């Protein structure tokens, strides 16, 4: 298993090196971030939010966390391999003092062959990639949320959450935040009134739940 992970890490490393040589998925999103940074250089040593559309759509995330400096680099539709591919563009240049990650939902939704174990293994690759360059930077992983439109995938989501939580329990400078159960009602179904009409993305009430769970763990 260790050899397999090393091979996968090597493959993803090669993808990172070659990401700029061809137009990989989400290339335009990444270039938009770079253009934005060139026009308005972001602060160094801020808190970096990175991941998929739950962050992309959190456009007013800074308003939820006054007193903290947030850089939001969520790009909608992305999966963990995409975050890995563009780590040199959207993680390391910012020298963040803390990294908050939400990603993995799209991995499960993309293919029937992707399991909770797959998501965990992909996250571990991302984690180890970050640790190679930033051995002590605090990392927060937000659990996969219970999206009504993806309710049929909940077992895979829960497996991914459990495996990532167990993995992080053995690491240093990390926090696993369980939003999954916080977003369920008394009937153990996703709460009503916290999602947009697509039953996938959250409205302000949904993000308020995230704010309550995340803020105690952010670094000043």
Over which residues does each language-model region extend?
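Conserved SGNH/GDSL esterase-like catalytic core that processes O-acyl groups on lipids
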Residues: 21-122, 148, 153-158
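Sec-exported extracytoplasmic/periplasmic mature domains
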Residues: 88, 92, 104, 128-135, ...
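A cross-domain feature marking catalytic cores of carbohydrate-active enzymes
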Residues: 103, 141-143, 206
């Amino acid at each position: 298993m260790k050899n397999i992970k090393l091979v996968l890490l090597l493959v993803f490393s090669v993808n990172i090196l070659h990401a700029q040589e061809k137009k990989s998925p989400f290339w335009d999103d990444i270039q938009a971030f770079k253009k934005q940074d060139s026009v308005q250089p972001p602060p160094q040593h801020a808190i970096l939010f990175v991941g998929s559309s739950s962050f992309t759509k959190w456009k007013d995330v800074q308003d939820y966390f006054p007193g903290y400096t947030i850089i939001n680099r969520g790009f909608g539709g992305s999966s963990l391999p995409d975050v890995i591919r563009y780590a040199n563009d959207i993680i390391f240049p910012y020298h963040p003092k803390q990294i908050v990650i939400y990603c993995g939902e799209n991995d499960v939704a993309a293919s029937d062959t992707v399991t909770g174990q797959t998501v965990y293994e992909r996250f571990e690759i991302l984690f180890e990639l970050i640790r190679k360059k930033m051995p002590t930077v605090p990392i927060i992983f937000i659990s996969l949320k219970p999206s009504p439109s993806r309710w049929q995938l909940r077992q895979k989501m829960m497996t991914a959450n459990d495996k990532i939580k167990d993995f992080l329990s053995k690491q240093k400078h990390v926090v696993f935040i369980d939003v999954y159960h916080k977003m369920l009602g008394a009937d153990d179904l996703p709460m009503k009134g916290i999602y947009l009409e697509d039953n996938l993305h959250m409205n302000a009430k949904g993000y308020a739940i995230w704010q309550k769970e995340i803020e105690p763990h952010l670094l000043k």
